[in-house]
UniProtKB/Swiss-Prot annotation:
SUPFAM superfamilies given in the database record: Cytochrome b5-like heme/steroid binding domain
Species in which this protein is naturally found: Mus musculus (Mouse)
Gene this protein is translated from: Pgrmc2
Spans through the membrane: 40-62
Subunit structure: Interacts with PGRMC1. Interacts with AAAS.
Protein name from the UniProt record: Membrane-associated progesterone receptor component 2
GO CC, one annotated term: nuclear envelope
Phosphoserine: residues carrying this PTM: 84, 98, 202
Region (Disordered): 196-217
Length: 217
């Protein structure tokens, strides 16, 4: 009985196929339905392709505008269209700093921003969006950033009010300090040393100052 039922179904399908092949009304209807389905699919696919193309054109236009104008605004920070502090300030002559002198250059009391790493003082004014009063690393402005960079700490606990000789840092942390020092040397102007208590500042000639700046350029 099951086999018979199966035979009926198979024969019925076969008959339908033959009728379709003979051009019977059932076959014509199936063909028309298939044609309609294909046409609808093509229409939908074409519409989707058109929408994708339009979106791609809009994104391309937006990207070109960003490349031309967005980067400029991003680099200039909040004062878009205005010169950055680094652009308006003359290059700082090389000199040495005590902790008290260094603290004056925090970006708030003066537009110039300095910080120290491993006994070296760097002018980071051109990175004011990072080291300025509102920047994510503004806590280091006008301070010795060595301990904070070595311990990855952005809290006031990483700052010392007195000279920090870093003697309690381990070998890995000191290596990190030296790596940070090298990175700052590559990116920012080295403007002098951070003086230890009682240490006298060095006198730098114009020739030494020019030579150091030439190396950095």
């Amino acid at each position: 009985m099951a086999a018979g039922d199966g035979d009926v179904k198979l024969s019925t399908l076969g008959s339908g196929g033959e009728s379709g092949g003979d051009g019977s009304p059932g076959g014509a209807g199936a063909t028309a339905a298939r044609s309609s389905w294909v046409a609808a699919l093509l229409a939908t696919g074409g519409e989707m392709l058109l929408n994708v193309a339009l979106v791609a054109l809009v994104l391309l236009g937006a990207y070109r505008l960003w490349v031309r104008w967005g980067r400029r605004g991003l680099c200039s920070g909040p004062g878009a269209g205005e010169e950055s502090p680094a652009a308006t300030l003359p290059r700082m002559k090389k000199r040495d700093f005590s902790l008290e002198q260094l603290r004056q250059y925090d970006g708030a009391r003066t537009p110039r921003i300095l910080l120290a790493v491993n006994g070296k003082v760097f002018d980071v004014t051109k990175g004011s969006k990072f080291y300025g009063p509102a920047g994510p690393y503004g806590i280091f402005a006008g301070r010795d950033a060595s301990r904070g960079l070595a311990t990855f700490c952005l809290d006031k606990d990483a700052l010392r009010d007195e000279y920090d000789d870093l003697s309690d840092l381990n070998a890995v942390q000191m290596e990190s300090v030296r790596e940070w020092e090298m990175q700052f040397k590559e990116k920012y102007d080295y403007v002098g040393r951070l003086l230890k208590p009682g240490e006298e500042p060095s006198e730098y000639t114009d020739e030494e100052d020019t030579k150091d700046h030439s190396k950095q350029d």
